[in-house]
Amino acid sequence: MDVLLLNLLNKKKEEINNIIVGGGDDIAEHLAWGFEKAVQMNWNNNTRFSILVTDSPWNGLKYHNNELFENYPQGVPNSKNIEEMANKGISLLCIKLKNDTNIMYNIFDNIYKKYTNKLKTLFQIISIHSPEDLINIIIKNSSKAYEVQRENEIKNLPI
């Protein structure tokens, strides 16, 4: 399984390297669309694992200090949020690239902690120093997410 995962990750790495990235008209990230897709996704099995890589916090002044230029100071209207991801048992690995995301990741951590009694999920914040670190982190943590989900399945088996 690790060889298949490594091959898939290497293919995705090539695809990511070919993406041309452009900016919006503010510094804050519009993460709501990604969270909404994760919540709506038809997961094939009980292992639900999402990776967030961002160099800026989510829209909304509560997720960062007021120094950032922000088009949505109240947050993105009518958006799914991180709480729905935690409630659905979607594990989240946050890749920290800059300290600008500290406030946001602390809020996410507190939200996930509220749901750990209901459903065990994996929430981690990991700083990386080079793009090569990302592949190893994904392999290691996707295995952890699978183990967490298996624990949930075993816990919920009828006795």
How would you label these PLM feature ranges?
Residues 1-159:
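Divalent cation-coordinating acidic motifs and surrounding scaffolds
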